[in-house]
Curated annotation (Swiss-Prot):
Its cofactor is [4Fe-4S] cluster. Specifically methylates position 2 of adenine 2503 in 23S rRNA and position 2 of adenine 37 in tRNAs. m2A2503 modification seems to play a crucial role in the proofreading step occurring at the peptidyl transferase center and thus would serve to optimize ribosomal fidelity. This is Dual-specificity RNA methyltransferase RlmN. It is found in: Cytoplasm. Reaction proceeds by a ping-pong mechanism involving intermediate methylation of a conserved cysteine residue. The gene is rlmN. It is an enzyme of class 2 (transferase). Disulfide bonds join C132-C369. Residues 125-364 form the Radical SAM core domain. It comes from Yersinia enterocolitica serotype O:8 / biotype 1B (strain NCTC 13174 / 8081). Signal peptide: none annotated.
Amino acid sequence: MSEQLLTASMPIDAAPLSDHAVATAAPATSKINLLDLNRQQMREFFAEMGEKPFRADQVMKWMYHYCYDDFEQMTDINKGLRAKLQRVAEIRAPEVAEEQRSTDGTIKWAIKVGDQQVETVYIPEGDRATLCVSSQVGCALECKFCSTAQQGFNRNLRVSEIIGQVWRAAKIIGAVKATGIRPITNVVMMGMGEPLLNLNNVVPAMDIMMDDFGFGLSKRRVTLSTSGVVPALDKLGDMIDVALAISLHAPTDDIRDEIVPINRKYNIETFLAAVRRYLAKSNANGGRVTVEYVMLDHINDSTEQAHQLAECLKDTPCKINLIPWNPFPGAPYGRSSNSRVDRFSKVLMEYGFTTIVRKTRGDDIDAACGQLAGEVIDRTKRTLKKKMAGEPIAIKTV
């Protein structure tokens, strides 16, 4: 697969919801939003219009390589087809409600999705630029150290609202690229929400990210992060191959039960077994998973707990990211001191684990890990909590 940088360039001359999800916001018009369709679905849509499949590929190239949303600008499409598309389809990405820029180059966009907002973050680092994308309006998992979880949960994002975050960011960056802002090289599903609780919209969106007629990223440059929805993780491995990161954050079940409540349903042993099953199917991970571990002062950061973590992960090929905790109002935790983080890291490295202390980015604009909040109307949190407590979570394929 060829790979391109995600930025708008100037040319030379609808998925079903998972059973557990509440209703996704309805389209504003009766037209088909082409951002909701991956390439297979686009070709089927064009076939229904009596058009050849390659016409769908042409339109996708204009949509994603150049970030065009006006059919009239697609000059290699005949006028008759352009007129037909104007009648039955549209390219409608979510709009930016607010932009904030950090002193370190990080950019946070508040993205309008219906009557609410999610947040998307652009993070430049060396020769890379990573876009952190949201998958849900809010989150139902209630991780105690995460600002998003404190907002409650409203709904899943549609495909167009997920890939639309990438489209909008690429268009903005393309418009200002002369100022030296780097094109997007990586996308991480680490924004608001649990991606595995929205598989039927997240998977087609990631498919578009990696499609040659989409954004053309390699599968190693698209990462999904999960807190441990085990049935959906098993399903993911049968649907798509992307890099995997796991939000572990504790070496033992007693601590993880408290700070990552889904652990009460799928404990660490069960979660890591599912991770190993995914790695056995995947070519995107280089044989190992990224373990994310937020450092909470005197909660999960002792030397003893570092030894416990090493023992916990001994059978799971991985690299470990230690993440300084980023505070938010009302949170019951403190950030681990540099000395405690250093000691923790050294223990892990003595066991042979590749261990990185993640640099905090965008904390001056509340864009750092765990700080994303957006604007969420919590309508369904209690229902989802009840399901997670006792009922199996049903997952449908696309």
